[in-house]
Regions:
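Sec-dependent signal peptide recognition
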Residues: 17-22
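Acidic, glycine-rich flexible loop segments
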Residues: 125-203
């Protein structure tokens, strides 16, 4: 096989070629994350989309402040990072107003979810790495999960039922500019699973 031939003849090549061979082996062993690149991908299942892979072409997240009021009237807040991931180029010019533009073809799919931060935070607080559970009471919670698809010239927006939503989002990396993680949530016959990397939008 070519791979074996390359190894057998590696010492007959010059030094740069040997370096390339070593790098190729490292990638094959998964030690350098060479296969990850900048991409990510989701697997969705719903009555509208069927079961399909959704390679993520663009993804954005933006923060708002969510307010909670308990039975005594006491108010608390938390950051809510609304996240969109799609297999087409999203328009992030004006946050939700443009991210939510109608799809233009039947093969386009957009996934949406919100990540609620810790108690006492607001839209200025950075998102923390950690687990956001669908079953959390209020904070460190994933909610408002939906899938947008298109058929017959019209968008079909399906929200996963909050009462039966299970699973979690694990944010593995979070900075001021970008968040990365894995999502695995379901409700009834609708589910979303996979990885994402979202650029954080900031208000001027």
């Amino acid at each position: 096989m070519p791979r074996h031939r390359t190894l057998e003849n590696s010492f007959a090549f010059n030094r740069p070629t040997l370096v390339l061979v070593v790098l190729a082996l490292v990638c094959a062993l998964g030690l350098a994350g060479c296969t990850k690149g900048g991409g990510s991908g989701l697997h969705v299942k719903s009555p509208a989309t069927g079961e399909k892979d959704v390679p993520v072409k663009s993804s954005y997240a933006y923060a708002v402040t969510k307010t909670f009021t308990d039975i005594t009237g006491k108010m608390t807040t938390a950051s809510a990072y609304n996240t969109d991931a799609a297999n087409y180029d999203l328009d992030a010019t004006n946050f939700a107003m443009t991210l939510d533009k109608p799809l233009t073809s039947d093969d386009q799919v957009r996934v949406m979810f919100s990540l609620i931060g810790e108690q006492g935070t607001d839209e200025k607080a950075p998102l923390k790495a950690g687990t956001y559970s669908a079953k959390a009471d209020k904070f460190m919670k994933v909610e408002t999960v939906g899938i947008v698809s298109r058929k017959g010239g019209a968008d079909n927006k399906v929200w996963l039922d909050r009462g039966t939503l299970t699973g979690e989002v694990k944010v593995t990396s979070a900075s001021a500019d970008e968040i990365s993680g894995e999502i695995d949530v379901s409700a009834g016959d609708t589910s979303i699973k996979g990885s994402f990397t979202a650029k954080i939008l900031k208000r001027k």
